[in-house]
């Protein structure tokens, strides 16, 4: 994966950095649980990929068993590249690495939103426990420090459809709204300004079919007590200054944040709660048991009664959930700051982040320093999780610039100041899951965020803390607890499925 491009799309050539590679070829089963409601077949890229995988490879799977042996042929590399995103300019100072063998109650693997929030909540609930966070690079190096900065509620799914249990959908919405308020309070308590603004989020609608679906969706959502609004085109244009969309629906409870500054909030909160954080500490091996044994590349061992997997897209490469998660490359770029006069000419009057209704979604945000960032579009998947390349990255950033100019023609000629990419974890049906795995049920996890991670990660951090404390009753009603995720085939069928699905959507997206 190449990231951190200093961009001029008209001049200059981006550079890519080398990274160390580790591998772990174990595979571990996990318990079955409640299944999230699937999204409609016509609208889900993930379902298309899954069906392509079975159609293209199913006969061969049974005939030659390649799907079973391919993990031993193609090891997925565990690549930790430096985070050179715009957000990374605000990365908090790093802690020293682990320098000796230790024994702990809970070891948290990964220093992003999931890991740091889990450490904070575990210590808050169980202050007698020794909790350590082990981060391979610096906190926020992964998806937590590279994302699109939108803080989203869970309003059913982003294709504007409720499940067969809309009352549960409303409870999930309320849970994510409450968490946004908790994040705001936590930021205030630490004294760190993470640029948290809860002035709502917009989904802008691309087609007339999207408009019809959204009107029905908003009507049902409001009947359940969700305060979402349908915005006709004039109101939409007044807010964000573009006429390219048909309409939109607005959620007043969403918002945006500076992701790396939010990482800093969680790092300080976890530290203040008594958690220990070790950075530049890579775990290369995990031995299961009633007491787990973790091995670092520095030669140290960690004995732990419980483990939290907070490794997002890298989770399969640690030997867990190999057939549940795709590590997908997402691309983001940011402009130089605009003056107030320039923003007035562009017409973006309200500082509301928005994303469109396409499957290969684009999303945009207006920062406090008047920069505009745009991300999304065609994601990337490379064979066996390998790194991307300069030509591929440049083509994605060019796509982002074309889309930015399409939305705001006045931005023609504006060059991105910086572009970056990073891998995020996607499940095939965009369903998240939180729970426990392993033979001794002492390995906790949260994954499959599929674009909702800025908010949902710390919801799952709270749930993990409750599970560790044996307090799972309040979460049993939620479909994401121990949810079994749709099957992802091994290579080469994974790559075949991903390329077929992505190519199909590039041809059919409006």
Task: Give each language-model segment a name.
Residues 125-146:
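Glycine-rich FAD pyrophosphate-binding loop
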Residues 34-106, 124-125:
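Extreme N-terminal leader/targeting segments of oxidoreductases
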Residues 248-291, 296-298:
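Helical element adjacent to the flavin cofactor pocket in flavoenzyme catalytic cores
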Residues 106-132:
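N-terminal Rossmann-like FAD-binding beta1-loop-alpha1 element of flavoenzymes
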Residues 189-197, 283, 301-302, 306-341, ...:
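Active-site substrate-recognition segment that forms the wall
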Residues 165-269:
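Rossmann-like flavin
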Residues 146-174:
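Glycine-rich active-site loop/strand segments that organize a redox cofactor
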């Amino acid at each position: 994966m190449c990231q951190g491009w200093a961009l001029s799309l008209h001049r200059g050539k981006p550079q890519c950095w080398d990274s160390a590679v580790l591998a772990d070829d174990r595979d571990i089963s996990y318990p079955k649980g409640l299944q999230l409601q699937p999204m409609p077949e016509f609208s889900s890229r993930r379902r298309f990929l899954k069906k392509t995988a079975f159609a293209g490879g199913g006969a061969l799977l049974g005939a030659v068993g390649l799907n079973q042996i391919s993990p031993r042929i193609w090891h997925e590399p565990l690549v930790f590249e430096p985070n050179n995103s715009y957000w990374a300019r605000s990365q908090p100072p790093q802690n020293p690495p682990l320098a000796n063998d230790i024994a702990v109650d809970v070891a948290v693997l990964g220093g992003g939103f999931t890991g740091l929030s889990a450490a904070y909540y575990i210590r808050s609930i169980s202050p007698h426990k020794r909790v350590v966070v082990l981060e391979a690079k610096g906190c926020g190096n992964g998806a937590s420090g590279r994302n699109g900065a939108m803080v989203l509620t869970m309003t059913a799914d982003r294709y504007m459809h409720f499940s067969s249990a809309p009352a549960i959908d409303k409870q999930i919405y309320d849970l994510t709204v409450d968490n946004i308020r908790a994040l705001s309070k936590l930021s205030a308590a630490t004294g760190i300004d993470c640029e948290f603004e809860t002035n709502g989020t917009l989904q802008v609608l691309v087609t007339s079919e999207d408009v019809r679906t959204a009107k029905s969706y908003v009507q049902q959502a409001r009947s359940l007590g969700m305060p979402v609004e349908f915005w006709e085109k004039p109101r939409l244009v007044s807010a964000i200054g573009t006429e390219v969309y048909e309409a939109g629906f607005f959620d007043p409870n969403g918002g945006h944040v500076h992701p790396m500054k939010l990482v800093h909030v969680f790092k300080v909160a976890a530290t203040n709660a008594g958690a220990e954080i070790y950075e530049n500490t890579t775990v290369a091996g995990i031995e299961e048991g009633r007491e787990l044994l973790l091995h670092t590349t520095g030669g140290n061992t960690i004995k732990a009664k419980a483990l939290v997997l907070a490794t997002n897209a890298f989770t399969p490469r640690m030997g867990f959930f190999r057939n549940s998660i795709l590590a997908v490359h997402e691309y983001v770029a940011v402009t130089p700051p605009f003056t107030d006069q320039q923003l007035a000419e562009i017409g973006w009057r309200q500082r509301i982040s928005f994303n469109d209704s396409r499957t290969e979604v684009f999303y945009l945000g207006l920062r406090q320093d008047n920069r505009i960032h745009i991300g999304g579009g065609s994601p990337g998947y490379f064979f066996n999780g390998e790194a991307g390349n300069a030509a591929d990255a440049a083509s994605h950033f060019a796509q982002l610039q074309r889309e930015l100019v399409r939305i705001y023609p006045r931005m023609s000629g504006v060059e991105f100041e910086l572009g970056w990419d990073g891998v995020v974890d996607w499940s095939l049906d965009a369903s998240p899951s939180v729970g426990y795995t392993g033979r001794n049920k002492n390995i906790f996890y949260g994954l499959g965020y599929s674009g909702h991670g800025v908010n949902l990660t710390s919801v799952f951090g709270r749930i993990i803390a409750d599970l560790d404390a044996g307090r799972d009753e309040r979460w049993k009603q939620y479909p994401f607890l121990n949810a079994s995720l749709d099957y992802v085939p091994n290579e080469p069928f994974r790559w075949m499925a991903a390329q077929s699905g992505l190519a199909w959507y590039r041809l059919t997206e409006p």
